Amino acid sequence: MFNNSFWIFFAIIHFIIVLLFYKGFGKMGLFVWIGFATVCANLQVVKTVELFGLTATLGNVMYGTIFFATDVLNEKYGPAEARKAVWLGFSTLLTLTFVMQGVLLFEPASSDISQTALETIFGFLPRVALGSLLAFIFSQTLDVYVYSAIRRIFPSDRLLWLRNGGSTAVSQLFDTFIFTAVAFLGIYPADVWLHIFISTYLIKFAVSLISLPYAYAAKKMIPNDERSS
């Protein structure tokens, strides 16, 4: 019960922090958040918890804020800025994976106490690392495209929820499928893999629903650097 209520609070706090970054630092704040969230989500993902009867990773909340941030960039600054943010996030993830694999290659001192912990967090199996990278770049690029397509058809501010929720729901479906297929398909029995796929997507979808009120707040928000210019 604690996990369920705290997870909702945890998710709300995440989106409030994104808005604070946007308010305080404008467009640059969203770019910084996307880089930070990409790293942080891949640290959190190693911890699994029970949520609403499902086994899930904590990284899904932080990962969901990346879609939220790119949607805000798309809505207020256009798809070109959103795509730039996607490539920033992908480059950050790729660099993190490469650099930390190098760190693990160093032989630890006899007095070292961190190697085992680092291996737990960063010792990705090749399939998991590949699945994460492929899922990120494909789903984030798709999110920008779908958001822009929905906006062309439904440009009204009242339908911001449709643009935000629709693009995220579609792109996260592909994100979940690509990651779980590359990382786990063939390793686990088909029924276990299907359970992982469904439970992961449901958690991500719940995060996208929580984000909707904050999308309207971001739409109305004028960052400090734009107010003074």
Curated annotation (Swiss-Prot):
Intrachain disulfide bonds: none
Keyword annotations from UniProtKB, A to Z: Cell membrane, Membrane, Transmembrane, Transmembrane helix, Transport
Top-level taxon in the UniProt lineage: Bacteria
Coarse class of the protein's main subcellular location: membrane
Keyword Cell membrane: yes
Compartments where located: Cell membrane
Pfam families named in the record: Vut_1
GO terms for cellular component: plasma membrane
Residue stretches spanning the membrane: 6-26, 28-48, 49-69, 86-106, 118-138, 160-182, 192-214
GO MF: transmembrane transporter activity
Keyword Ribonucleoprotein carried by entry: no
Membrane topology (UniProt): Multi-pass membrane protein
GO biological process, one term: pyrimidine-containing compound transmembrane transport
Family: Belongs to the vitamin uptake transporter (VUT/ECF) (TC 2.A.88) family. Q precursor transporter subfamily.
Role of this protein: Involved in the import of queuosine (Q) precursors, required for Q precursor salvage.
Protein name, per record: Probable queuosine precursor transporter
Protein's gene: ypdP
